[in-house]
Design a protein with these regions (language model features):
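An amphipathic, aromatic/His-enriched active-site/gating alpha helix that lines ligand/cofactor pockets
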Residues: 58-59
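RNA-contacting regions in translation and RNA-metabolism proteins
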Residues: 1-48, 65-83
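Residue-level signature of catalytic and energy-coupling elements of molecular machines
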Residues: 26, 53, 62
Length: 83
């Protein structure tokens, strides 16, 4: 059985690849820091706007999904987009 935090990373990666024009350039890292798991999303510079969305709606929705998954797992997650 896979580690639950890895499932959250995989979820973010899958959704991000569906949103952007260059899915092969999507990278997702997972960092444990101060008792929380930070999911770092990196996309091609040309796809940054698609990852963030109009007025930040897309990234806000992704963060909501990550937080909901963390709530179910009793774990704290944070999503960051790397430039």
């Amino acid at each position: 059985m896979s580690e639950p935090t890895g499932d959250v990373r995989t979820l973010v990666e899958h959704i991000a690849k569906l949103l952007v024009d260059a899915p092969d350039e999507v990278l997702v890292y997972q960092v444990e820091e101060n008792g929380e798991t930070i999911i770092e999303l990196e996309v091609a510079p040309a796809d940054m706007g698609k990852a963030i969305g109009k007025h930040g709606r897309t990234v806000r929705a992704l963060r909501s999904l990550v937080n909901a998954a963390g709530f179910r797992l009793n774990k704290r997650f944070e999503l960051e987009i790397l430039e």
